[in-house]
Amino acid sequence: MSRTNLFLLLLVFLAGTSCNKQQHFISDDAFRAEVEKDFQAKQAALPNGNLFSVFNQQMTPDEKEALTFLYAYMPIGDITDYDGQLYLDNIRSSFRARVEMPWGDSIPEDIFRHFVLPVRVNNENLDESRMVFYEELKDRVKDLSLYDAVLEVNHWCHEKVIYTPSDARTSSPLASVKTAYGRCGEESTFTVAALRSVGIPARQVY
């Protein structure tokens, strides 16, 4: 075999190996196995109903691993009270933001997993705010640095919701937009949801 043919054969082999190597949402093998174990325990604890039927849908390996992570660690009430499609839609929107926003590749995997991907912020009702907010915010922040994008999202939140004392219940992000007011916990929940919608890690701090 000539040296040229040997080189070409090596290139084909390497290309095939690269194509067959599965990309994981959770790159650490040990942690991925731990998540799967915890997910199976959650399934075993909730055997009745079709609470995990969303996993029967066609999805990418990344989407399935992200969904498995959410279900493994979300409160049981969030599994029983909400359709799984809500979580899958949120995952797909968060992945879209990671691809389309200029800072997406710079967010570490574990930070993205814990502070961008989750739907819940506090004790609010869950809604489709991530998808709604992304469509409204993406053009305002897509050409900004991460620092300036955080400021711009904060300005946008101020345009939408003002502070007003209320009761102890926490309104959902979309409900806060509808009423245009919220107490401190509601405003921070709203802001965290807005930041996460464009792929910026965020959480409440007390």
Predicted regions and their residues:
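Bacterial Sec-dependent N-terminal signal peptides
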Residues: 1-26
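Aromatic-lined, polymer-binding surfaces characteristic
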Residues: 162-164, 181
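Conserved short loop/turn motifs at secondary-structure junctions
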Residues: 173-181
